[in-house]
Amino acid sequence: MDEQKETEAVEELTKAINFKLDMQMLRLRAAFYESMGDISSALQDCEAALCLDPNHAETLDMYQRAQKLRFQS
């Protein structure tokens, strides 16, 4: 996916999240942030999603991956 489409997707997800906080939307936005190289924002969204569902395996995996990427930078 190109950067412009990723940015548009993040903007639309942000609108939806602002309307109604949702773990799946937070996780999806975190994935876009990670893909765009915005590891800090990806971590924030993972943390927010994990507050809603602390045992969600995919989000835990993404959070751990993003933490590793942050420490590699």
Predicted segment positions?
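Alpha-helical tetratricopeptide repeat
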Residues: 1-73
